[in-house]
A protein has these predicted regions:
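Extended alpha-helical scaffold regions
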Residues: 1-201
Length: 201
């Protein structure tokens, strides 16, 4: 089992966020409890739930939660759950997408040897959404084409990743006004998103 050191300030942050968001207080209390008991799987699920709440993307609190907690426990988390939290956290950057891109590229560089298969594809897709927001069409095109090649060589890929990819490629082709590919990818996105939602419900 990995040994991680969580500073006392992390627990203070969790308590403060629970007080700031009364409707989420129970969830923050679960985070505190699971953290104290080293229940990493449950904790990763808690963090995803928090990052999906509509209250937090409109603030800087996900960034604060990342810097004050997630950064310390990242080695214990499932890499895909960690990346899902990172993707949701990027909503906090809003008009600072250049900073978000640098942040994501640093994660990619740090984990170059660790990320294989799904993780490698997911971080590439997250970068693609940054390129989309920054209107960096050449870089986005590279992500779309390279990720499509990645899929062709892998049959064991979760439907959620296909959903993410086809959402990205649909938005890419819409920007290019390539409507044939736009509609083809949009249909694929809807199919995989429906499959993913059915799986988790």
């Amino acid at each position: 089992m990995l040994d991680v050191s969580v500073p006392k300030d992390s627990f203070k942050l969790i308590k403060n966020l629970g007080e700031k968001y009364p409707s989420l207080k129970t969830l923050f209390e679960e985070i505190d409890s699971n953290l104290n008991q080293n229940l990493w799987y449950q904790l990763s699920e808690n963090l995803i739930s928090i990052s999906n709440k509509p209250e937090l993307p409109n603030s800087k609190d996900l960034i604060q939660l990342y810097n004050g907690l997630v950064l310390f426990i990242e080695p214990t988390l499932n890499p895909m759950k960690y990346l899902e939290f990172v993707q949701n956290m990027l909503h906090n950057y809003k008009d600072k997408m250049e900073e978000a891109l640098v942040f994501v590229e640093n994660i990619e560089r740090k984990n170059a040897q660790k990320y294989k298969g799904e993780e490698k594809i997911f971080i590439k897709i997250i970068k693609g959404f940054c390129f989309l927001e920054l209107n960096k069409m050449y870089e986005l095109e590279e992500v779309v084409k390279n990720t499509e090649q990645d899929f062709s060589g892998n049959i064991e890929i979760d439907s959620s990743l296909y959903s993410q990819y086809y959402k990205l490629s649909t938005l890419y082709y819409e920007k290019k006004e390539d409507y044939d590919n736009f509609y083809n990818n949009a249909f694929q996105y809807l199919a995989y998103e429906t499959k993913y939602q059915t799986k988790i419900n």
